[in-house]
């Protein structure tokens, strides 16, 4: 099978010059936020599906790249609904992970807590001109 050279639809390669610009901008953001007392944090790109899904469904539900259960947890022949197959997903923004992070670590964080997070997010919606399925976000 021949190697497919182009990235998956909605994704893009970042060449060195663009990476230089991105790193410059990210460093400026870190420096500026640091001046105002913000601390850098990092959260996993994979979150529990319950945290990513809203109870009402809606638009956010359509954004989630869902990850199938693995190993013994995945029982295809017994699955009756999506919840039987999926237990996690890729974050579609940084706000949901920040909420989980704060909830989990509040006792160890200063008050007030000022957080800066920059990282990739993924959205499963159909890509359009100038919009990608994977992109960098700052929260």
Residues covered by each model-derived region:
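TRNA-recognition modules of translation machinery and tRNA-sensing kinases, especially anticodon-binding
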Residues: 1-139
């Amino acid at each position: 099978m021949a190697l497919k050279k182009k990235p998956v639809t909605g994704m893009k390669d970042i060449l060195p010059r663009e990476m230089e610009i991105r790193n410059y901008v990210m460093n400026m953001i870190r420096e500026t936020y640091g001046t105002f007392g913000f601390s850098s944090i990092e959260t996993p790109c994979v979150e529990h599906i319950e945290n990513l899904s809203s109870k009402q469904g809606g638009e956010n539900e359509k954004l989630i790249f869902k990850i199938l259960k693995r190993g013994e947890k995945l029982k295809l022949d017994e699955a009756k609904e999506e919840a039987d197959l999926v237990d996690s997903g890729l974050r579609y923004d940084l706000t949901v992970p920040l909420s989980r992070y704060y909830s989990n670590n509040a006792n160890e964080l200063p008050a007030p807590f000022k957080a800066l997070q920059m990282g990739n997010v993924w959205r499963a919606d159909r890509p359009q001109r100038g919009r990608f399925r994977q992109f960098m976000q700052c929260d």
